[in-house]
Amino acid sequence: MKEYTGGCHCGAIRFAFHSEESAQMWKCNCSICEMIDYDHLFIKHDLFKLTSGKELIEKYVFETESAKHYFCKLCGIKSFYQPRSHPDSYSIHLKCVDD
């Protein structure tokens, strides 16, 4: 497994996670993911670590409230969230992972 890092646009929220280099990316057709062209990379909770910016995270829920969408209070980017489809994983926005 390889360690990756990423975060929001302004850099206030940062995270690290471990994943196989051949991990599969998913597209979602829910209303919020389609609007922002969110590319999903599901990472188990124990392989994810929020490294900075916890106090700058704003949570948004809708409909069933089972998915927890986390946004940066400063720049508005959703770099990861808790999907309802994978309760044991976070969904990392692939476009928010560092090169």
Regions found by a protein language model. Name each.
Residues 1-7, 12-99:
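A short Gly-Trp-Pro
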